[in-house]
Amino acid sequence: MSKSPKKSKSLTRAGNRPATISAQQTIPYVRMLPDGICQLPGGVYTKTLEYEDINYSVASAEDQTAIFGGWSSWLNYFDSSLPFQLSFVNRRSRSGSRYKVNISEADDRFNSVRTEYTGMLKNQIAKSNNGIERAKYVTFCIPAENVAARPRLERVEADVIGNFKRLGVQSQPLDGRERLALLHGQLHPGSREPFRFKWADIAHTGMGTKDFIVPDSFDFRQSRSFRVGQTWGAASYLQIMASELSDKLLLEILELDAELTVTMHIQTVDQVKAIKTVKGKISDIDKMKVEEQRKATRSGYDPDILPPDLVTFSKDAAGLLADLQSRNERMFLLTFLIVNTAPTRERLENDIFTVNGIAQKYNCAVKRLDWQQEQGYMSSLALGYNGIEIQRGMTTSSTAIFIPFMTRELRMDGPSLYYGMNALSHNVIMADRKKLKSANGLYLGSTGSGKSFAAKRELLNVFLAIPQDRIIVVDPMGEYAPLVERLGGQVIEIAPDSPNHISPMDVQMDMGGGDSPLSLKADFLLSLCELVVGGRDGLQPIEKTVIDRCVRQVYRELALGLDKAKTPLLQDLYEELLRQPEPEAKRIATALELYCTGSLNLFNHPTNVNLNSRVVCFVLKGMGENLRKIAMHITNDFVTSAVGTNFKNGVATWCYFDEFHILLRDPLTASYFVTVWKMLRKQGCVPSALTQNVKDLLASREIENILDNTDFMILLSQAQSDRAILAKQIGISEHQLSYITQSNSGEGLLFYGSVTIPFVDRFPRGEIYDLLTTKPEDAANGKQAE
């Protein structure tokens, strides 16, 4: 029958009892309290929790077994006095989506880049889950005479939250308004009507809570479908015929691009009663066996040959009794409902056909609730009400196979950055590395896998979304220059024929912190001289003393704060060494001569580049191995100084080190990166290392220290030998390895703390794509387009 909140009908029922039917009366609850307790007819009180997802689909076989065991224990908590309901609600995203683009508008020379990146983010957000928002709830029920049920409800709520926590699942209770908002969404499928409600509105308007959630109308006149407002719907139940179920059945239904609600009403059977019932069934089967044997004897057949079905029933019953008595199994009565909704009847039937196809694949069937559409729809609401009496007896293990977990989502608020789309849930991935215990990161992938693209995308996202943070890039191959220049940054090419100069003698006297700037500079110059002089044993004590004396002398005027003081050059240190009487000073000066007055004097010039630019990129290509070591050492000194200065100003520094395996070859540089990974992160440094050569990376003696202090990692497609190494070193499961095996560019695994997510990033072509890509064919196409 059709029901409208505006028009109510008086119908005559059996016994001439008039019944006023309205849409409000259709919703099966008596009252909703502000604290989230809901009273149902018959003196039942309920509460609802929302819970998050955890990684199951990409977990190892051992972890999946552990999750299954934990979920079984979670189910066993509920006794026969605690019926409960699991609700899985898939709805089309509303305009007030939980996803936000966190890039502020501005009017500057980066408008085109900002507009394009923001447009990309909005498009990815719109595509998240194909516009489907998925949520999971559990509602538990307690029979009681009045709201004195509250203490027990609160105790059960605390237990359920604690049991979820042991599974690694975050959960939170819904208050009254949140439960009403959930019901409003379920009662307005396909609608963009916002939920407007305040508890004060009840006193002001005289309306009840149902008036704020009720749709325009219900129409249950048809036997196999219904209408709510302008939306079509159908309620069905899952007929379980399989002897063994798959953990993929529920997950595949929930992954559909359709609006639906899957509901599991579960009632625990008292253990004594369950065992007694099974024993009774076994007795019945034994009687049937005796009868069959008598028939066989009378007919002259072998009495040991019994009908196959009877043998199967006997074994199943005996196994069930053993499970209940000795294997921590309980007996549950399960009502499994599926409610589909769609804007048209044709779309509704197509969606139901798809769901039924999934069910049949696992030897189950989706059956329509003929002439029970109203009861089925109301039983799908997250209230704890079940008006459908179709129940299936299930053990703990068979119930637990409907595992409600698929993949952990990573959707953080605040200054979070975009890292692609979750390959399993198709949700956008937004994460804030600064919230990790260690923000240090690694990008690992074979040539052409998209690791440089991913790092540059993050760099650009930092630039646009966190305007106060600084960015430093150490680029051995010169791949970042176009992006840095477009962002108004400073590209510093360090090479013998480069016009760019950085003086290793520069010092900031106002760095702050506990260490003296001159002491730090003296320590740096000692290590620089050690690198220049070379030798297996390094600098001798006398040589170190001489260098320290000369350093203090050349910085004397700066230390005294004299107005005429100038920052010394490397040649000033060289000349000061020549003035010293010790023969060791002559040896050091001779070693420095090549870099002061010789052909490699590129570091013997005043700094002529803007080291205070928000984005600084050091390009280290075009130099020999020895010069590269010195250039790297000087660059490292700048990074340390910049991180310290930025930290003093309350600013984070994002550092990117490409071709990391090359940088680790030099012991001094490798030792420096351990310091970065261990110490500089405490000063707001967010370092990222990139490499395609996993073997060389893991061959470094320092890699253990770096890996132990890395909580963020992006793995893209890997060569076969590298996959084996990574699986052993990092502990990647076989299933997880499939995401980095011959995968396309921009596909892989993201590790964020304890969270592992397979991701896909299909970045649209445009100005940003051209700035980020390093593929030769893309560069060629870009030039042709110009």
Identify the residue ranges that each predicted region occupies:
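Extended, folded cores of ATP/NTP-driven motor/assembly subunits in large transport
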Residues: 2-407
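P-loop (Walker A) phosphate-binding loop of NTP-binding proteins
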Residues: 446
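Walker A/P-loop NTP-binding active-site region of P-loop NTPases
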Residues: 449-503
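A short beta-strand-to-loop transition that corresponds to the Sensor-1 phosphate-sensing loop
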Residues: 477, 689-694, 717-720
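Conserved P-loop NTPase
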Residues: 730-785
